[in-house]
Amino acid sequence: MERGSLLKAKAGGKLHGGNHGIAPEEVVAAQRARMSVGMIEAAAQKGYAAVTVADVLERAGVSRMTFYQHFANKEACFLAAYDMAVEIVMTRIGAALAAESPALERIDGALDAYFSTLAQEPEVAKVFLVEVYAAGTAVLQRRLATQAGFVDAFAGALGASLPDQRVVAEAVIGAVVALATNRIVAGDFGALPGLREPLMSALITKLVRQDPAGS
């Protein structure tokens, strides 16, 4: 798969002036998607703090009036961009966790999907795990909720329902995120897929031994 292809697919084609031949709500959705992609690209390249609304307009090919019809400010646009980044990453993880296979195989597939998606989509990765910290309280709260969702998904896949098991699941997800973030900050995207195997070992020793059904 081409690097960055998942993000490019979200942008779609540019709409030109006049009659688009599509429903108004589809035009609105397409404009919002292009601005979200534009924010992801700009934040990944410049850092969120340095991004201006003009940067997003240039990449999305929309007017300033259109921008403010969708978003109150830059932070609101970034929140939509972050949600898009989450969707790109979680779609592949969700498919792996929903597979009809033993717990360990589903967890292995989810980790593979997580690291391979971040490696394939470097701009998404930067927004998802790095620039999110610079974008304000509302976005940070969304990021914490996203990580809690990861913990729920992993704990659920392994049947980790006891409080102590939940803490271990939280620690494992914390390690996954921290290791990925360190590589992304360093620009070492190629190293991301190689993190899966050692983390699987940690999952085996910390979680699966507490869940006979998953062994």
What kind of feature is each model-predicted range?
Residues M1-A30, L158, D211-S215:
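N-terminal intrinsically disordered/low-complexity leader segments
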Residues A30-E41, Q45, R59, A76-A96, ...:
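Alpha-helical structural segments
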Residues A42-A76:
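Helix-turn-helix
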Residues T52, K126-L129, L192, S215:
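Short, hydrophobic secondary-structure boundary micro-motifs
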Residues I93-A96, E100, F128-V132, R183-G187:
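Secondary-structure edge/capping motif, primarily at the C-terminal ends of alpha-helices
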Residues T117, I173-G190, A202-G214:
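Amphipathic C-terminal alpha-helical segment
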Residues L118-T137, T181:
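Amphipathic alpha-helical segments used for helix-helix packing
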Residues G136-A171, A178, P193-S201:
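Amphipathic alpha-helical packing segments from all-alpha helical-bundle domains
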